[in-house]
Amino acid sequence: MKTTLALSMATLLISSSAFAADFSATKDKLETALAADIRTDKEVARDRNRKPVRTLEFFGFRDDMKVVELMPGGGWYTKLLAPVVADKGQYYMAIGTSRASKAVAGQAGFDKVKVTAEEAKIYRPEGSKFYALEADGLGVSDMDMVLTFRNYHNFSESGRAVMNKMAFDALKSGGVYAVVDHTRRHMQATDNENRRRFDPVLAIKEIQAAGFKFVDMTDLHYKPDDELRYEVGRKSVTGNSDRWTLKFVKP
């Protein structure tokens, strides 16, 4: 019994050490990306709030992964993810990629960035506060990770279902679906103040319904001063919104 326990502990320690060593190389590359000239002063100013290194470590991001970022916005995370995986992995951006593509076009170290699911359509139906999403898939498979930051709230229920299915189909077994968004109170009805927030319990329910296993969450982006009452774009809330950070795995 003691021998078995000792062996188990030794295995755990070795695994933990290997995990730390694996991320050490990735962390070094992330630190280099964080210091790169391509990043604007406004982007750098958000580092303290967004905690990208710790967030990506939580998700299990590594420099040899094939990753897809959904709706990369202006490319804040693109400028960190793409150079880290450039040598040993692959970065794809998908859905609403025009601003991010423009931000890194022609820049040294970003020539391997690929755009996928270019046929995807995002539109807001007349009278709706949320976007619809039409797409056959992400156009890639066997991915290690699909990430999306502060986008889940933008879509209608059917749009979210499409997005979750796209992520599921693109990932390999064991692949990670990493999702971050602004927190809304559980079961709170939608209004103009919370429209860009989302209930994390509902997110978990929907993503599990797509076939994913919910494996972990972190309070890295917990903000006790956010009353969850006001629009995230308000001056008093911007940069200080409470955000849920959820990790799912494809079985």
Each PLM stretch: what is its role?
Residues 91-94, 174-186:
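Conserved beta-strand signature within the Rossmann-like core of class I S-adenosyl-L-methionine
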Residues 130-133, 154-167:
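A short, conserved alpha-helix within the catalytic core of class I
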Residues 82-83, 161-174:
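A short glycine-rich, Lys/Arg-flanked "PGG" loop and its adjoining helix->strand segment in the class I
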Residues 63-73:
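Conserved class I S-adenosyl-L-methionine
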Residues 136-146:
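A short acidic, Gly/Pro-enriched loop at the edge of an enzyme's catalytic core
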Residues 190-217:
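Conserved Class I S-adenosyl-L-methionine
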Residues 210, 225-251:
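Core SAM-dependent methyltransferase catalytic element
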Residues 26-63, 76:
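Class I SAM-dependent methyltransferase Rossmann-like catalytic core
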